[in-house]
């Protein structure tokens, strides 16, 4: 998703406008009516950001992957945040998945404070987000008396629709 403030302008007539992020620039040609727009777009990757990623050991070979990083608003600060939190070997596919699934720095920080960080691989973080496991869900299990439940069992409980109300029955 995009914040309205990211757009260079929202035209009411057929027009061209851009959104620029570290991964690149999306140029859109179209029209907005109210809060909805339609049209066509082109994406131009940012070669400097691509070079930065390569220096970080993340080799991007397809423009599509750069566009996915753009859509997830993945930037230098985000990559540095991952590395500062112990994720040294970040693959292109994991970085793309983190962006696609909306694992922002705030979401990750929440996971780090809620769950035992040593078990939180990038794959596990993505799995938590996909299945909607969060601090509130873990707290509801704790409040129902289920305190030292292993992370994988918490995920499985969420997948199978087990919640505090179910546990109270």
Region annotations inferred by a language model:
Residues 1-169:
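General marker for long, soluble alpha-helical cores
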């Amino acid at each position: 998703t995009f914040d309205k403030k990211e757009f260079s302008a929202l035209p009411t007539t057929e027009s061209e406008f851009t959104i620029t992020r570290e991964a690149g620039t999306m140029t859109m040609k179209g029209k907005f009516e109210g809060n909805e727009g339609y049209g066509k777009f082109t994406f131009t990757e940012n070669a400097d950001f691509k070079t930065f990623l390569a220096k970080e050991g993340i080799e991007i070979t397809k423009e599509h992957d750069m566009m996915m990083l753009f859509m997830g608003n993945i930037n230098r600060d985000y990559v540095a945040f991952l590395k500062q939190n112990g994720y040294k070997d970040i693959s292109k596919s994991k970085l793309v998945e983190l962006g696609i699934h909306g694992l922002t720095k705030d979401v990750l920080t929440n996971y780090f404070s809620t769950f035992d960080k040593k078990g939180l691989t990038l794959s596990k973080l993505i799995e938590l987000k996909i299945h909607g496991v969060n601090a509130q869900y873990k707290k509801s299990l704790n409040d129902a008396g289920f305190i030292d439940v292993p992370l994988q069992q918490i995920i499985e409980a969420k997948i199978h629709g087990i919640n505090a109300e179910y546990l109270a029955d």
